[in-house]
Amino acid sequence: MVANNAGMPATPADLINVDEVIGKYYDVVPDPNVPEQRVSFGTSGHRGSSLKTSFNEAHIVAITQAIAEYRKKAGVTGPLYIGRDTHALSEPAWKTAIEVLVANGVTVRIDSRDDFTPTPVVSQAILTHNRAADGTQRFTGEGLADGIVVTPSHNPPTDGGFKYDPVTGGPAPSDVTNAIADRANELLGDFKNIKRVPFEQAVKSDLVERFDFREHYVADLENVIDFDVIRSSGVRLGIDPLGGASVNYWPLMNEKFNLTIDVVRPQVDPTWSFMTIDHDGKIRMDPSSPYAMKGLVDSLNNGAWDKYDLVGGTDPDADRHGIVCPNWGVMNPNHYIAVCVEYLFGGNRPGWPEGAGIGKTLVSSSLIDRVAASIDAKLVEVPVGFKWFVDPLFKGEVAFGGEESSGMSFLRKDGRVWTTDKDGLIPDLLAAEITAKTGKNPAQLHQDQVARFGESWYKRVDTPTTLEQKAKFAKLTGDDVTATQLAGEDITAKLTEAPGNHAKIGGLKVTTKDNWFAARPSGTENIYKVYAESFVSPEALDKVLDEAKLVVDKALGE
């Protein structure tokens, strides 16, 4: 269901009271006996809201202490790089974390400009720090760095988030996050006895070092993006940071590489009063959502396109991207991934390792599969979650990793790792490179792909379920699917493991020649998600979705 106010400008009633949100961060103490108030530390870290007693000072004290203990056990002896985004709760949590880290004797690197720090910038800082003298990546030995990013990503303004990046620079694997969460919950009830150094004292200590995140990241971008072709073409790129952490990075790119990137909306406002409402009636800073981006698109259609050839967007921590093209609007992330893959693997990155694959999540469009087959590139299909790309990117087994929720990263031009977390800045820059090199914008190139590979229709539907049903998903096997056809086509695969790495997908994927669906339970809500795609017709997609529910119900024994 799309909310009635989706795509409408935010009203005063939609805005948070920043003082209340920050005040409750400090004043409200969670009860460890209430499940909703405990630490839940997934691959995107711990997320919650001070208004719901799920993101408060106690949580951050306990989580940071757990991280300090974990890195000590793991032998991580180098600095910890810490950054924050523009959410109201991010600065208080950032300060709390520094107090605990310094009390634990951890060397902490903070931004020398006292600026916001995008997620990919922290990843890139960790990876370059951990690079050996011969240019290879180290993940064992003395002096290795790790990091923390304080962000709930594109979540609403009420929310806070706190995630840990180990020495591989990307989302921590489940065994690490589970250990941190378990220890944090042990500490939560007694958080006041955890040692801290008051912030003003901590930042003056020798343990807190200033690091120019912005300079370090931006100067290195020329090793990932072809700025020469962008500059010589005169492509006019606009960027909407959506009030997020990338806002001050684009002007430095102009300065360093003699570009003319225009920051469309440079304001930072923790209420995000300038946004249009997302599909569910909330303010959500998602650069791939046509509803959240409607204000920008309307202004472009009302004359602003005279200034730009294309516009890119990033979310609050700049790990997600959005691409907006004239006469098209916001591109579907699946479509943009397919365009990127054909461009990058089609001769424009000759320094990439031979045989390095294209990484995609199993709920991303099969258009990517068709493009990969046409250029004879290896496809590596993994479960949902960018954490599955960390090791393959780190080791150069994939040169590109992308997911349907507008997250991607790819290797440097010389084939070495760039980031192992999602990077929302380089896809925006790549869109300008692609336009400059091909003479067509990504939407036009997508239309060319549709002419060659066929048009597809894609949809995600959420279905209510129970905790008992959710538990059954993990135990499914292909044998639990008794159907032989889906939407009139013979079933060609019944998957409960991802073909690219044989990891359990926590659900089910069923494919035919021109259709597929995947079903998996939500990690945070009592719903299961069904993703589906058809290369036949919109009506066939509806049929796939209808039959998917029957297949899932029967497989679960309902």
Model feature map: region roles:
Residues 2-15, 75-172, 369:
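Ferredoxin-reductase
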Residues 2-103, 128, 199, 207-237, ...:
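An N-terminal, well-structured beta->alpha segment
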Residues 33-43, 195-198, 263-270, 523-524:
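Flexible hinge/switch segments at interdomain interfaces of large molecular machines
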Residues 57, 116, 121, 516-518:
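Metallocofactor- and cofactor-centric catalytic cores in central/energy metabolism, strongly enriched
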Residues 440-558:
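Catalytic-core signal marking the mid-to-C-terminal active-site face
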Residues 12-15, 20-27, 107-123, 131-132, ...:
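Phosphate-binding chemistry for phosphorylated carbohydrates and sugar-nucleotides
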Residues 83, 147-153, 313-316, 401, ...:
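Short beta-strand segments
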